[in-house]
Amino acid sequence: MCLLFLPPELTLLVTSHLDSPKDFLGLLRASRKFYILLINELYERNVRSDGGSALLWYASRGDEVGVRNMLRAGANVNLRPPDRAQSTALLQAVTTKHTRVVQILLENGALPDAADAQSMRPLALATDGRSDTAITKLLLEYGSMANSVAFDKHTPLLRAVRSNQESKVTLLLNHRADAHILERRTGMNLLHIAASKNASLRIMKMLIDNGIPMDSQDRQGRTPLQVAVTYSSTRTVSLLLRLGANPNFKNKIQFWNGWTALFYAATKSSNSRSDNKTIIQTLVKHRAELDSKNYSEETPLLQAISRGAIKQAQVLLDCGASITPIDANGETVLHLAASSRSWCPNLMSRLVGNGADVNCAGGENGETPIFYAIRNSHDLKA
């Protein structure tokens, strides 16, 4: 007799003797009638076998019906499979950005701060990526700790600032997230991090309003403005200056001793497509000292030339930088421009045309710039 014609009671009796999950699934897929009759038995079997591991599978795929059915069958909402990841259904749903599933799990008792094997909690995952802000809101409303940290010691607020997510930063600060934490490796505070990521005006203002000093320093002695310049974050440079950042604040750490924001701008940008032209012009517009000197008596112009940042040197000259300063080695702009690292005929011509002294003796051996050029085999026709 064909199984399809058996009464439901007898079909269930037959399937109760199918110990192999493969055989049971094969029967389930044989017809729509069997699927409707046996699907709940499938959920219950999974719960009986391991507590309901299928719940994690449904959660990771955003299958609301599957999640509800597994919970109805008695699945442990906080179940962890016996693998290295030690994930939960909630962590899976947050990772895959399924807002409705997150809500269902929380409503059914999912622990909002249950961490995986790497100490990653749902709130850290929600604030690290571009997931729905509603997920962050749900987690906080269900008691997730705003200042929890993962293995990397990064808090949810740091993650939200780093990824420039205004709405999440607002939510976290409203739930008393600590705005004064530091990034462990660099000693950067949240304002430094925001500056490095070209953050929005609203984020910058929220952090400042929460008491982060405008000219606070990281482990390298840099202020948020100097960090913004370092990362060629043009928008943030302008925002910080408008909010009152000091463009002439001098770094006091040994290697960078005496550096102001203009020195960072006069260095070759980490962004190969940027020559920091707009940043330099913005700093000068906000009264940055063009001829400020660092510990080795260099000005931003001298530093730009010595480091081969020719485009930056040209911009500094456009802004009115002096060509007369001499560094601690007795070298002028022409000595440095004639060196092998920063040889540029156009720059040499411009410096000479602007009145740079071609006969000034300097450096360790008291040489004129032409000796530097000859030593480095430069074409002197320019």
Question: Model segments located where?
Answer:
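Ankyrin-repeat boundary/"N-cap" motif
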Residues: V47-W57, R80-L90, A115-A124, V149-P156, ...
